C-alpha cells in the first residue's frame, strides 16, 4: 500500500511513479497509454478521456475501474489534507490572549468556539466495491484439467489403434520428403528433441508456480493442449502414413488382443509418450507431431506470461524450441508435413484463444463475431466469462518460507510486467 505521505504528494508524482501505481493496482494495460502522465494528469482523467485515443481501446469497461481507483486516490488525498489542516478533525483558529505583563500570546481554540467543538460534515464519494477482475475459479480449472487428461488418454488409445493399421516398411516404403533428401539421419537427434522438450516443460512449470493468476492461465493451457491432442486423434486416425524411415522398429501387432493393448497403452501413458523413456515403440502417430505441439506451446506460454524485459529468457526458450523441432526432422522420426501442420495448428489456436480472451466483445456471440462459430466457443465462454481484460503478468512467492534477497529487493506481491 502507498503511504499517507505518498498520497499527499500524488499531484507531484512523476510518470514513473504513476506507472508504479498502475502496476501496484494490477492495471498494467494502462502503462503504455499513460507513460507520459504525471500525478496531476492522472487525477484529472475523466470519462470523456476514455472515449478517444489513446485510452478508448485499452479496457473493455471504458476505464471504469481506473476511474474508481482514481476517486479512491482523491479521497485519501483529501482526507490527509483535511487531517493536516484540522485538530482532531476540527478547524483550529488562533486568537490573541493578553498576558499579565501587557504582551499578547496566541491561543488556539477549536473552530473559534470558546467552550467547545463544532462538528463539520464532509461528504466523501466512496466507490462501490467490485468483485475481482480475475477470479481464480479452481473448479473450472479442474474441469479443464480433466478435459486435457481425457484427450491425452484418447490420443494414447488412438496411437495403439493406428499402430495396428500401419503397413510394414518392406511393403510400403517411406514417402518422399524434401528435408530427408538434403539431410542425412542423425541417430541421437530425437533424444535432443525430447530433452529440450522436458527442459521447456520444467521451465514452464516453475514459472507457473510463481504466477499470481495461475488458475486462469493453467485453465487456458489445459483447454488449448487438450484441443490440440483431440485434433491429433482425428488426423492420425483418418490418414495412416507409412513409417518415415527404414530405421523404425515397430512393436509387433497384437491382432485384437485387447488385454495386451491395454497394457501397452498404460506403458505409453506412464512413460509420458516419450521414446527416451522406452515407452513409445509404436508407429503411425505421424500426422501431426505431438513433440512439435509441446515444444511450440510451452514456448508460447512462457513468452506470453513472463516479463517483456526478460528478453534473454525468451531467446533461450525460443532456441530450445527451434533446435528441438529441427532435431525431430534431423532424426527422420516425422515427415516435414507433420511438423509444419503441428506448428500451424498450435500457433493459430493459441493466438485465436488469447485474442478472444483479451477482447470482451469477442466473448459475446453475434452476427459480426465470426470467431463465435468455432465448435469450442461455448466451453470458451464458460471458462473465460468472468475474466475481465488482459490477465496481468503478476508474480508472487507461493512458498511459506521468505524469499532470499540477493542483490536488490524483489517484491513478489507486485507486478513484474513490462508492457
Swiss-Prot record:
It is an enzyme of class 2 (transferase). One of its GO terms (cellular component) is Golgi membrane. Keywords: Apoptosis, Golgi apparatus, Kinase, Lipid metabolism, Membrane, Phosphoprotein, Sphingolipid metabolism, Transferase, Transmembrane, Transmembrane helix. Residues 331-419 are cytoplasmic. GO terms for molecular function: ceramide cholinephosphotransferase activity; ceramide phosphoethanolamine synthase activity; kinase activity; sphingomyelin synthase activity. It is a multi-pass membrane protein. InterPro entries: SAM, SAM/pointed_sf, Sphingomyelin_synth-like, Sphingomyelin_synth-like_dom. The keyword Heme does not apply. One of its GO terms (biological process) is cellular response to tumor necrosis factor. Its EC number is 2.7.8.27. It is found in: Golgi apparatus membrane. Isoform 1 is widely expressed, isoform 2 shows a more narrow distribution and isoform 3 is detected only in testis and heart. Disruption phenotype: Null mice have hearing impairments with stria vascularis (SV) in these mice exhibiting atrophy and disorganized marginal cells resulting in significantly smaller endocochlear potentials (EPs). These decreased EPs, together with abnormal KCNQ1 expression patterns, increase with age. There is a decrease in plasma, liver, and macrophage sphingomyelin (59%, 45%, and 54%, respectively) and a dramatic increase in glycosphingolipids. No change in ceramide, total cholesterol, phospholipids nor triglycerides levels. Diminished macrophage MAP kinase and NFKB1 activation is observed. The modification Phosphoserine is found at residue 14. The chain crosses the membrane at residues 142-162, 190-210, 221-241, 282-302, 310-330. Pathway: Sphingolipid metabolism. Signal peptide: none annotated. Residues 13-76 form the SAM domain. The active site is at residues 291, 334, 338. It catalyses: an N-acylsphing-4-enine + a 1,2-diacyl-sn-glycero-3-phosphocholine = a sphingomyelin + a 1,2-diacyl-sn-glycerol; 1-(9Z-octadecenoyl)-2-acyl-sn-3-glycerol + a sphingomyelin = a 1-(9Z-octadecenoyl)-2-acyl-sn-glycero-3-phosphocholine + an N-acylsphing-4-enine; N-hexadecanoylsphinganine + a 1,2-diacyl-sn-glycero-3-phosphocholine = N-hexadecanoyl-sphinganine-1-phosphocholine + a 1,2-diacyl-sn-glycerol; N-hexadecanoyl-(4R)-hydroxysphinganine + a 1,2-diacyl-sn-glycero-3-phosphocholine = N-hexadecanoyl-(4R)-hydroxysphinganine-phosphocholine + a 1,2-diacyl-sn-glycerol. Major sphingomyelin synthase at the Golgi apparatus. Catalyzes the reversible transfer of phosphocholine moiety in sphingomyelin biosynthesis: in the forward reaction transfers phosphocholine head group of phosphatidylcholine (PC) on to ceramide (CER) to form ceramide phosphocholine (sphingomyelin, SM) and diacylglycerol (DAG) as by-product, and in the reverse reaction transfers phosphocholine from SM to DAG to form PC and CER. The direction of the reaction depends on the levels of CER and DAG in Golgi membranes. (Microbial infection) Contributes to the brain SM production for Japanese encephalitis virus attachment and infection. Belongs to the sphingomyelin synthase family. This is Phosphatidylcholine:ceramide cholinephosphotransferase 1. It comes from Mus musculus (Mouse). The lineage of its organism: Eukaryota, Metazoa, Chordata, Craniata, Vertebrata. The gene is Sgms1.
Amino acid at each position: 500500500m502507498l503511504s499517507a505521505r505518498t498520497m499527499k504528494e500524488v499531484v507531484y508524482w512523476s510518470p514513473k511513479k504513476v506507472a508504479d501505481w498502475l502496476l501496484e493496482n494490477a492495471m498494467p494495460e494502462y502503462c503504455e497509454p499513460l507513460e507520459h502522465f504525471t500525478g496531476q494528469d492522472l487525477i484529472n482523467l475523466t470519462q470523456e478521456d476514455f472515449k478517444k485515443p489513446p485510452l478508448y481501446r485499452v479496457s473493455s469497461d471504458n476505464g471504469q475501474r481506473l476511474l474508481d481507483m482514481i476517486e479512491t486516490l482523491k479521497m485519501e488525498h483529501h482526507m490527509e489534507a483535511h487531517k493536516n489542516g484540522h485538530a482532531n478533525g476540527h478547524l483550529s483558529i488562533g486568537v490573541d490572549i493578553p498576558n499579565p505583563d501587557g504582551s499578547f500570546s496566541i491561543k488556539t481554540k477549536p473552530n473559534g468556539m470558546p467552550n467547545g467543538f463544532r462538528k463539520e460534515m464532509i461528504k466523501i464519494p466512496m466507490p462501490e466495491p467490485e468483485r475481482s477482475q480475475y477470479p481464480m475459479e479452481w473448479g473450472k480449472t479442474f474441469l479443464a484439467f480433466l478435459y486435457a487428461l481425457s484427450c491425452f488418454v484418447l490420443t494414447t488409445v488412438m496411437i495403439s489403434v493406428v499402430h495396428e493399421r500401419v503397413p510394414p516398411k518392406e511393403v510400403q516404403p517411406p514417402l518422399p520428403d524434401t528435408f530427408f533428401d538434403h539431410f542425412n539421419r542423425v541417430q541421437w537427434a530425437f533424444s535432443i528433441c525430447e530433452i529440450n522438450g522436458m527442459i521447456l516443460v520444467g521451465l514452464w512449470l516453475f514459472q507457473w508456480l510463481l504466477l499470481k493468476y495461475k488458475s486462469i492461465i493453467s485453465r487456458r493451457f489445459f483447454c488449448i493442449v487438450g484441443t490440440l491432442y483431440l485434433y491429433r486423434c482425428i488426423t492420425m486416425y483418418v490418414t495412416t502414413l507409412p513409417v518415415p524411415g527404414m530405421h523404425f522398429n515397430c512393436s509387433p501387432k497384437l491382432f485384437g488382443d485387447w488385454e495386451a493393448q491395454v497394457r501397452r497403452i498404460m506403458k505409453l501413458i506412464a512413460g509420458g509418450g516419450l521414446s527416451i523413456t522406452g515407452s513409445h515403440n509404436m508407429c503411425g502417430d505421424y500426422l501431426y507431431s505431438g513433440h512439435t505441439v509441446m515444444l511450440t506451446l510451452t514456448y508460447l506460454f512462457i513468452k506470453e506470461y513472463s516479463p517483456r524485459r526478460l528478453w534473454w529468457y525468451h531467446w533461450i526458450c525460443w532456441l530450445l524450441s527451434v533446435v528441438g523441432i529441427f532435431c525431430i526432422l534431423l532424426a527422420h522420426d516425422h515427415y516435414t508435413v507433420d511438423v509444419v501442420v503441428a506448428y500451424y495448428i498450435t500457433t493459430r489456436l493459441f493466438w485465436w484463444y488469447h485474442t478472444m480472451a483479451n477482447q470482451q466483445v469477442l466473448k459475446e456471440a453475434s452476427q459480426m463475431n465470426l470467431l463465435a462459430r468455432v465448435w469450442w466457443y461455448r466451453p470458451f465462454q464458460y471458462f473465460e466469462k468472468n475474466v475481465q481484460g488482459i490477465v496481468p503478468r503478476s508474480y508472487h512467492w507461493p512458498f511459506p518460507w521468505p524469499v532470499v534477497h540477493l542483490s536488490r529487493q524483489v517484491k513478489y506481491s507486485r507486478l513484474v510486467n513490462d508492457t
